[in-house]
Amino acid sequence: MMEESGIETTPPSTPPPSTIGTSVAASTSAIFTPVPPVLSSPLAAPAFSPLPSFAQSSFSTPVPSSVPPLRTSVPLTYASPLPVTSVYSPPANTSVSAAFSSPLPAFSSPPSFPPPPLNTTPGPVLTAPPMNPPVGGFSMSSTYDITKGHAGRAPQTPLMPTYSAAPVTVLPNPVVQAPIAGIGSSITFPEEPEDPRVHTMHDEGSAGGIWGFIKGVAGNPMVKSVLDKTKHSMETVITTLDPGMASYIRTGGELDIVVTSIKEVKVSAVRDAFQEVFGMAVVSGEDGQSNIAPQPVGYAAGLKGAQERIDSLRRTGMIHEKQPAVSVENFIAELLPDKWFDIGCVIMDDPVHGIRLEAFTQATPVPLEYVQQAQNLTPQDYNLRWSGLSVTVGEVLERSLAHVSRTDWHVAFTGMSRRQMIYSATKALAGMYKQRLSPRIL
């Protein structure tokens, strides 16, 4: 049907190749793209596939009239008879003069140039611009300007370079390298003599393993002393901030003591004293009866009252017959003519070990007038008159003096409380008791 409509169906054929002597007129409106002949080269003979042809109207840029006709009769000049293995595609309407001595028309298809004749004089040799930074072992297989397209700067990665890797030297790490011998500080410090006990401890630890080391540390007297001081310091800090914590920290152990009173002034003083001496002790209070006058008079009455408190608890079954007990009893005594003093008696009774100890607090002076008032207030027919008075000295002082308590009037006369007096005497008693006990019990 295409033949009937008058349209030719013959495909366009490739225009015949133009010869080298053909000239292009200045008034031509389009540049014909000739296919240059492929010449055989003794060095390299690349094979090219047929190039596609373009229509005559594919280029519309007119050639200026000032351009003279191109002549290709001048022999081409090459820098070196190297085989052309790369294909260059320069832009259109640009004269290539990097490797030729005469201007050539711009090609739209990659040209293939024949090798130069043997009698051709070599032209000036163009060398590649120096690289920055220089790289050892760099070689170029072409004279192509690699700085083209990079504003005159050498690209970071050249297009077709081949590198020969330089030997890599591994630098030593400055952090781990050993210091240079012979270089030292001008400042010297005196060396302390080594303690032989430390070496002995380390030798025992290494010989017996970890348990031997622990045993050696635990058996070192210096370590024991440091640990004891540290423990004591911590307990002191805790008990200073909160005195009530002392009974919880030091309560425990095998030592169990009962105080024959429920008054805190007596129980707390005995507890602190025994825990101070033994480290840990269980101290509790039970209400024991003295069965003597409220205000004992004389040492014998004081001792009788303290012992009666212990016996009353054992008779009633409040404590075991073999239970160690501590009893405190205060009394007055005329140590000098018309000189009366208040004294506290502290006794320790341990039937299991057969230990009985007595101690006394410091003597607190009592004015004679207050003692006489207590004697006058006691009836003559008082049945316990043999042991003392029915009215205590503390009651008389509380009635006579303002801001004075019957239970702790000692601080008003001496500046030292009754509790501190009992604590001091009981601490001495606990020290004697510790010396009497067998080492296996401790």
Swiss-Prot record:
InterPro entries recorded: ITPase-like_fam, NTPase/PRRC1, PRRC1
Keyword tRNA processing: no
Gene: prrc1-b
Name of the protein this chain belongs to: Protein PRRC1-B
GO biological process, one term: epithelial structure maintenance
Keyword Ligase in annotation: no
Residue span of region Disordered: 1-24
Predominant cellular place of this UniProt entry's protein: Golgi
Domain of life the protein comes from: Eukaryota
Gene Ontology annotations for the cellular component aspect, listed alphabetically: cytoplasm; Golgi apparatus
Organism, as annotated: Xenopus laevis (African clawed frog)
Alphabetical UniProt keywords: Golgi apparatus
A molecular function (GO) term: protein kinase A regulatory subunit binding
Family note: Belongs to the PRRC1 family.
Subcellular location: Golgi apparatus
